[in-house]
Amino acid sequence: GNKNNAGAPLKVLAYDKPKDPTKKWKTSLVCEFLHNSHNFHPVNWDKDIEEELLITGQEGTWHLDRKKDGTWNRKVVSEEFGGEVRDGLTPDGERIVATIEPRHGSKVVCYRKNGNNWQRIVLDTTFKDGHALACADFLDTGGDQVVAGWRGMNPRAVPGVKLFVPKNKDYTEWETHQLSGAEIAVEDLKAADLNEDGKPDIIVAGRQTHNLKIFWNES
């Protein structure tokens, strides 16, 4: 078993859809090495049509890619305990990975691909119960920015949403903009162009505050 995030690791399973979806779905093992994993994110970083997974947990953030034999390759992005994970691109097409660390944590972090390694840039250390992330080009700069939210449930604090904007093309310097505060305790958020004006908007859901808020992108 597993107690206090030690012992048997969790299992991540893939479900294969049968021709008749009302029948039993077969499962296959994706990975079995993480403890206290809180989030994963589908990506497509290679040239095939199949998606891969970014997953984060106590053992860090990992990229998982399914091979032809059904097993999965894994490559580490970071060994820091992560709770949320999303990916994005710089204007030059370089990949970034954004995380909240640790689970329900205080840090917002951006990892930038640097050769075979990932450079870690800490964007914020003041979150209380960080719980949501998205990467998108909200400002039409040609590269993605990071939006992140926190709940303020444990420890108790005023919740909020912040937008993090890179100040240079290397994504090593950032500026921060506060978007909201106590009105919504962020359980999750998404980026999507809701009014089809070509600009991603931000949809934020609050569980503790029982509300939903849309930040319309008027930039």
Where are these regions (language model features)?
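Beta-propeller-forming repeat regions
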Residues: 1-219
